Design a protein with these regions (language model features):
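Residue-level signal for inorganic ion chemistry
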Residues: 1, 23, 46, 95, ...
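ALDH superfamily catalytic-core signature
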Residues: 156-297, 360
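Hydrophobic face of alpha-helices
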Residues: 2-9, 20, 43, 110, ...
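Glycine-rich loop-to-alpha-helix module at the N-terminal edge of alpha/beta enzyme cores
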Residues: 1-56
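Generic secondary-structure signature for well-ordered alpha-helical cores
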Residues: 10-17, 28, 32, 51, ...
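Rossmann-like NAD(P) dinucleotide-binding subdomain of oxidoreductase/dehydrogenase enzymes
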Residues: 55-192, 317
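Residues at or immediately preceding the N-termini of alpha-helices
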Residues: 16, 31, 190, 222, ...
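Conserved C-terminal structural/oligomerization subdomain of aldehyde/semialdehyde dehydrogenase
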Residues: 122, 146, 183, 237, ...
């Protein structure tokens, strides 16, 4: 198995330019993000999990791992190839077969991946790629022949899947929405923070489940941070995803653009103050200006609902305890960021927060060896690392008792 997975990883790296262009054409993300982040990370996941293929006996001490069986994998439109790698790499390393369904708006990289799998001489039938819309996904969920289902997407659809599979002997992993808090303390390196905040919310047009869409700033530095953020937003370039100078590309679909616009209008109606830089948008396509809200209340929809777009809500706090309370005051629990020079404060905050991933003085940093997943309505189960192997195996006693 390791031989095949290593081949896939190498072929992805060799054909990275093809995949990068395809991801940007299909999904609208800037080519520099597809080229420098998505494709290298996808390849890295296959490289990492290839190393586990012959070491599974050492991953679970005292237990004998067996393949779960047939895995159904449904992936979203925001990171098509990367999410395919998150599902396929551990599933193959553990000896499973997979039926992979990409999102209906971004199927192209999955189809090119099928060509790579054939090029790697993966045996026929080990990975099956099924394209289609919601009806296709529902048919896969309700098929009855799956031993394991893994889904990344919206919380509403994830809840529906969980209800449909209730009472059935199918292992389930759900990686759903988020409303992450990026928390800035007064002792933080402000310029570094600003770059981390921008990366945390405007990367991939905000189409990121773990995006830092809520900014919590300690009161003494709140005005300074907002001032620097506004200045930085004025330098962001919105436009053609295939232009290497573009910072924000296209919104994925008309449906998503309508949702973003509606929630931004709701924020204005509820009394928040909207700032958008004076930048030109292309005449054709689905584009939205990077947006910043101040004077935001925790009860506002923009502070509670996942917008999944380039929209940042700024709130303030006085004490670490208040920051924790506000950060946890959401239905989600996927990720968070903490910016401070005090290591003890980082550790204390991380323990108090209900977030599956907590970044310290950075944001949106990923590694295949680090597990990723959430709490509450952000789902359950972990992907990546040794913990990410567990959903793809059945553990039997090691020996006869």
């Amino acid at each position: 198995r390791a031989k095949y997975i290593y081949r896939i990883a190498r072929l992805l790296a060799e054909r990275s330019r093809e995949f990068a262009v395809l991801e940007s054409l299909d999904g609208g993300k800037p080519i520099k993000e597809s080229r420098d982040v998505d494709i290298p990370l996808a390849s890295a996941h296959f490289f990492y999990h290839a190393g586990w293929a012959d070491k599974l006996d050492y991953a679970f001490v005292g237990r004998q791992p067996r393949p779960a069986g047939v895995v159904g994998a449904i992936i979203p439109w925001n990171f098509p190839l990367l999410m395919a790698a998150w599902k396929l790499a551990p599933a193959l390393a553990c000896g499973n077969t997979v039926v992979l369904k990409p999102a209906e708006t971004t199927p192209l990289s999955a189809l090119l991946l099928a060509e790579v799998l054939q090029q790697a001489e993966l045996p026929p039938g080990v990975v099956n790629i099924l394209t289609g819309g919601p009806d296709t996904g529902a048919s896969l969920v309700e098929h009855g022949g799956l031993d394991k289902l893994t889904f990344t997407g919206s919380t509403s659809i994830g809840k529906g899947i969980q209800q449909r599979l209730a009472g059935q002997p199918i292992k389930l992993t759900l990686e759903l929405g988020g409303k992450a808090a990026n928390i800035v303390f007064e002792d933080a390196a402000i310029d570094q923070c600003v770059e981390g905040i921008v990366n945390g919310i405007y990367f991939n047009q905000g189409h990121v489940c773990c995006a830092g869409s809520r900014l919590l700033v300690q009161e003494p530095v709140a005005d300074l941070v907002v001032e620097k953020l506004k200045r930085r937003l004025g330098t962001l370039r919105v436009g053609d995803p295939l232009d290497k100078n573009t910072d924000l590309g296209a919104i994925n679909s008309q449906e998503q653009l309508t949702k973003i616009t509606s929630l931004v209008e709701a924020g204005v109606e509820e009394g928040a103050e909207l700032y958008q830089p004076d930048c030109q948008l292309p005449n054709e396509g689905y584009f939205f200006k990077p947006s910043l809200f101040t004077n935001v209340s925790q009860s506002h929809r923009i502070a509670q609902e996942e917008i999944f777009g380039p929209v940042l809500s700024v709130l303030t706090f006085r004490t670490p305890a208040e920051a924790v309370e506000k950060a946890n005051n959401t239905a989600y629990g996927l990720s968070a960021g903490i910016w401070t020079e005090k290591g003890s404060r980082i550790l204390w905050m991380a323990e108090q927060m209900r977030a599956g991933v907590v970044w310290a003085n950075t944001f949106n940093r990923f590694d295949p060896s680090s597990p990723f997943g959430g709490y509450k309505e952000s789902g359950f189960g972990r992907e990546g690392g040794r913990q990410g192997l567990l959903p793809y195996v059945e553990l039997e006693p090691d020996g006869i008792v």
